[in-house]
């Protein structure tokens, strides 16, 4: 009986975790997750973590982007060479673009 109870509690905890009940930030009626790093499509914590980009280190205008290749596809259809390039474009657009997916568009 105790094993069944533990299994039930674990199942409920996982259900809540993946359903987005514990996600940080808000979610609008179109399903976009909004945080200080930007907006991301989808629901739930797992989807959010896949599309999470922290642009804090690139907000300083004195920071220049390197040429390392780690492409990101923006919601504007543009492929950005790396996280820094995406974050600079995000800042320039005043948050109007979002991360669509990792990799080339």
Curated annotation (Swiss-Prot):
- Give the positions of the site Reactive bond: 67-68
In terms of SUPFAM superfamilies, this protein maps to:
Kazal-type serine protease inhibitors (SSF100895)
Indicate yes or no for the key word Kinase.
no
| Cleavable signal peptide | 1-23
Any one GO cellular component localisation term in the record: extracellular region
**Can you say where in the cell this protein is located?**
Secreted
What superkingdom does the record give?
Answer: Eukaryota
Classification via SMART domains: KAZAL (SM00280)
Domain called Kazal-like: residue spans: 49-105
Q: Which GO terms describe its molecular function?
A: serine-type endopeptidase inhibitor activity
Keywords attached to this entry: Disulfide bond, Protease inhibitor, Pyrrolidone carboxylic acid, Secreted, Serine protease inhibitor, Signal
Q: Which InterPro entries match?
A: Kazal-type_SerProtInhib, Kazal_dom, Kazal_dom_sf, Prot_inh_Kazal-m
Cysteine disulfide links: 55-87, 65-84, 73-105
Q: Where Pyrrolidone carboxylic acid occurs along the chain? A: 24
Q: What this chain does, per the record?
A: Serine protease inhibitor selective for kallikreins. Efficiently inhibits KLK4, KLK5, KLK6, KLK7, KLK12, KLK13 and KLK14. Doesn't inhibit KLK8.
Name the PANTHER family for this protein: SERINE PROTEASE INHIBITOR KAZAL-TYPE 6, SERINE PROTEASE INHIBITOR KAZAL-TYPE 7 SPINK7
Q: What is this protein called?
A: Serine protease inhibitor Kazal-type 6
Q: Which organism is it from?
A: Rattus norvegicus
Q: Which gene encodes it?
A: Spink6
